[in-house]
Amino acid sequence: MVKASRDFQVFVKPEGSACNLACDYCYYLSKAALYSGSEPVRMPEDVLERYILQHIEASPAEVIRFSWHGGEPTLLGLDYFRKIVSLEKRHRPPGQGVVNGIQTNATLIDEDWCRFLADEGFTVGISLDGPEEFHDFHRRDKGGQATHARALRGFDLLQKHGIQADILCVVNAQNVQWPERVYRFFKRIGAAFIGFLPLVERRPEAAAGVSPATAPSEAFGGFLCTIFDEWARQDVGRVKVEMFEEAARTAFGREPAVCVFRQTCGDVPVIERNGDFYSCDHFVDANHRLGNIRETSLAELLESPRQRAFGRAKAETLPRACQVCEVRAMCNGGCLKDRFITTADGEPGLNYLCAGYKKFFTHCRPFVSELAALWRSRQAGPGKTAPQKIGRNDPCPCGSGLKYKKCCLGKSRLHT
C-alpha cells in the first residue's frame, strides 16, 4: 500500500460543474466543456468507491478528510451522500477517524439535509458574500433570481441543528468598499469562521488586465486591515478569520494551512466525476490533467513527477523582489494563478494581489508577533525555556479554550 509523503486535501467533484446557480464570477461552470455528452453526469458508484478506497489508503494523516465540492454537491441528493458515508465506513481501517466536508451554496439545504449532516459529523462551508445587495449582485440562479434569502435560510437551518457552518465570502469590486458592513453582517448572523477570498479574473485584453468585478489589490488589503482592527479590538477568540489565522501561524512558527500561502503547493488536487485527476482547482485543463484514478492510483498521482513539479514551481518561479520581501514568510508569493503582473524592475511573475497582501501582512504583523510572544512567555513559566512552537496539546492561541490539536492545528478550510 503506497502512502502519500505529505498530507493532502482533494476537492472531489462528483457532479462536475453542475450547479443550480449561475454566479457571474464562477470560474468552474465553464469546465463542463471539457467533457462530452457521453460522460456520466455524476460519478458512478464504482469510481466513487475506487476513489474513497484510494484516498483512505493514500492518507498519512491520523484523521482522513474528504472534501465534497462542485458545482453544487447537494444536487447529488441525500441518497448519494448516504452511499458515500457507507463506503467510507466499509473501507476505513478500524479505529481511524473520517471527517467529511461539503462546500455548498446552501440554497437546497432543508431539514433532512441538516439532520444527515449533523448525524454524520460533516463540516459545512457556505458561500455568502455579505449583505443582500452585495451577495445578489453576482450570485443569482439560472433564472436570474436573487439567492441571498435562500442561502441565509440554509445557514440558519444548519445553526438550528447545531452545525456551525464556515462562511466563504468572495471579495469583489463591490463589497471590498464596505469592510465594516460585510464583517458586521457576518457577526450579526452568528458566523464563527469567515474566509475572505479575493476575486481575481485575469483579462489580458482589458486596460487594467483584470475584469471590472475583480477586487483591486490595494483595496483588498485595506478591506482586511479595517476588519482586522475591529477583530483585534473585539473578537479575538470569538470569531475566526482565515487570513488572520494564517498571519498568526507564521508568528507561532507553524506552516501555513492554506495552500495559497505555503512555500510549495500541489497538495490540493481535483478529482472530476469520471475519475480524472487535475493538479489544482484553478488548473482544471488539458495541460494539468495528470491521469485517472481508474488507471493510476491516487497516491501515485499525488507523488508523480509532474504533480511535484507543479508544486515546486510556486517557489522556483518566485520573483527576486518576493525573495527579499519582508513579509515573504507570510505570503510566499500567493497563488500561481494570480502571478501575472511584473515587479518594479520588470521581472514577470508578481502576484496581482501583492500590494494588498503586503499592506495587510505589514499591518497585522506587530499584533500577531506580540500575541505569539505573550503566549510563549505564559507557557514558559518560572525557570523554563519558552517554547518556540505550539504543541498539539497546548491551549489554542486563538482563545477558543480548546486544545490546539482540536482547534486550529492543520486546518485547511474550503478555499474555493
Model regions: which residues?
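Membrane-interface junctions of multi-pass transporters
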Residues: V284-R328
